[in-house]
Structure formats: structure tokens, C-alpha cells
């Protein structure tokens, strides 16, 4: 039974190590007033988008903020213009929901079991923009998410920086390996007979 606890313990540790980053997606959020609103995450972290929500009737329903969020490329992020409907990630479309504000979550994982899931890589940035549903004004809210890479350690002091690595030591280099027998030249039976013939004649004389 103790072997069954090992993977469960590892899963719990990985979940405990993951952080959640909350973004309130509405025009009143001061962080959106800057052009470079950026969130830094690590693999297996979560991004929680909190949609606009109104608890009373002080705002007319037609004026309640609703957004379509897109996951786009850097150029489209800069222009705040999605390229296609295939880039739609979520919709914030229930501003007066009784259960409270909608929460939309993204997990930054390297691999996903879902066909339509998104896979993320360390050292890369990803871009979210939105277009308003509640009015036709070109109001753009955008967010940049950077997946931080692993911490790299500096080389040891005694290591020789001029020392060259052999191709076989570099996993990225394709090394040709011989297959079958050794590539060294082999003598045929006739050649062996010619070489041994003088010794045989000396033994019989």
C-alpha cells in the first residue's frame, strides 16, 4: 500500500506548489490603464479571470460590461485586434448572475489531455485581449502573461570554459552510431590461408 501513496503525495505537492493569479477583467481595474499590464507565472500556475459583476440595479443592464476574451499573437495584441473567431478563449456574459461573478481559469501546463486545450512553454509570453459586447466602442483591455523559465545555475569555478564538449556529450547533436558488426576491415578465409601457408610448410619440412 505504501507504493500507492507515493504518486498521490507527489500530486499533492505539485498542487500545493502551484500559485493562482487573479485578474479583475473590467474597465475600472487601474492595472489595465497601463499599456504593459503583465502577469508572471510558472508552469502549473493558474490565471483566474474575474468577470464584471453587478449586485444591484444601479446600472442599467444595457450598460453592464460584457467581454469576449481572445488568446492572440503578439502583433494582434499590439493592435488589439483578433484575427479570427478561433482565437476566442472565453466570454464574460453574465454580469448580473445570482451566484456571483464568473471566474474563468487558465492552467499553464506543458501538456494537456484535451484536444482544444492550450499548451504553454517556459520562457514564452502569451497575450490576451478583449472586445466589448455591451457597446460598439473600441475599448481594449489586454494582458500579457509570461511563463518564467527554470532557474539556471552558473558553471562551477573549476570548470574550464574553453573545454569543448564532445558531440556524444551534447544531447542535441545527432551522433551516427554503427550498427551490426565492427566497421574495422576483416580478412577473408583465403587471405588467412595465404598468410598461414609458410608456417605450415615449415612445420612439415
Curated annotation (Swiss-Prot):
Keywords: Angiogenesis, Cell membrane, Disulfide bond, Glycoprotein, GPI-anchor, Lipoprotein, Membrane, Secreted, Signal, Tumor suppressor. A lipid is attached at residue 182 (GPI-anchor amidated serine). InterPro entries: Cupredoxin (IPR008972), Ephrin (IPR031328), Ephrin-A_Ecto (IPR034252), Ephrin_CS (IPR019765), Ephrin_RBD (IPR001799). Residues 183-205 form a propeptide. Glycans are attached at residue 26. CDD domains: Ephrin-A_Ectodomain (cd10425). Residues 1-18 form the signal peptide. One of its GO terms (biological process) is ephrin receptor signaling pathway. It is found in: Cell membrane. Undergoes proteolysis by a metalloprotease to give rise to a soluble monomeric form. Pfam families: Ephrin. GO terms for molecular function: ephrin receptor binding. Disulfide bonds join 51-92, 80-140. It is a lipid-anchor; GPI-anchor. GO terms for cellular component: extracellular region; plasma membrane; side of membrane. Residues 19-151 form the Ephrin RBD domain. It comes from the Eukaryota. Monomer. Homodimer. Forms heterodimers with EPHA2. Binds to the receptor tyrosine kinases EPHA2, EPHA3, EPHA4, EPHA5, EPHA6 and EPHA7. Also binds with low affinity to EPHA1. Belongs to the ephrin family. Cell surface GPI-bound ligand for Eph receptors, a family of receptor tyrosine kinases which are crucial for migration, repulsion and adhesion during neuronal, vascular and epithelial development. Binds promiscuously Eph receptors residing on adjacent cells, leading to contact-dependent bidirectional signaling into neighboring cells. Plays an important role in angiogenesis and tumor neovascularization. The recruitment of VAV2, VAV3 and PI3-kinase p85 subunit by phosphorylated EPHA2 is critical for EFNA1-induced RAC1 GTPase activation and vascular endothelial cell migration and assembly. This is Ephrin-A1. It comes from Sus scrofa (Pig).
